[in-house]
Amino acid sequence: MLINISSIVGRLTYPLGAVYDASKYAIEGFSEAMRFELEAMGAKIKVIEPGLIASDFGSRSMQFAHDPSLEAYQPLVNAMGSMAAKFTEMAEPAEVVAEAVWKAATDGSDTLRYPAGQAAIAALADRDALDDLTFYAKTKERFGL
């Protein structure tokens, strides 16, 4: 069994996350491909998709954005920065990831994706329910862009 840790941003994306989000999209694609390739050998592939988890990731991942030479980015950086407190309140404990890993490892199913936490479940359901243009507009509105 192969259990990969992705993120909800492997299936949807948010402002200022291009590089990180792309890495998670890669994990999703890799996992889907490996599922096809290894299924005949009896291997199970699982993907864990956490949402916002309580950690210092948000502050560390946004350090690049505070570069004064990225002047054109500053309005976006400021808008996203104003949301930081709200993101912190929404964060779920790391245990939701551990619970999703445990479920994936022990449920005996062929399920591929396991959202980790209620916020992840809600965000992915919201994305699945919307077409691309509506999702883009709603995301811009959510972040005040």
Predicted segments — roles?
Residues 1, 18, 26-29:
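Conserved cofactor-binding/catalytic machinery of classical short-chain dehydrogenase/reductase
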Residues 4:
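Rossmann-fold scaffold of SDR-type NAD(P)-dependent oxidoreductases
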Residues 43-85:
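C-terminal beta-strand-loop-alpha-helix "lid" module of Rossmann-like NAD(P)-dependent dehydrogenases
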Residues 45, 85-126:
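Core catalytic loop region at the nicotinamide-binding pocket of NAD(P)H-dependent oxidoreductases
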Residues 23:
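Active-site helix of classical SDR
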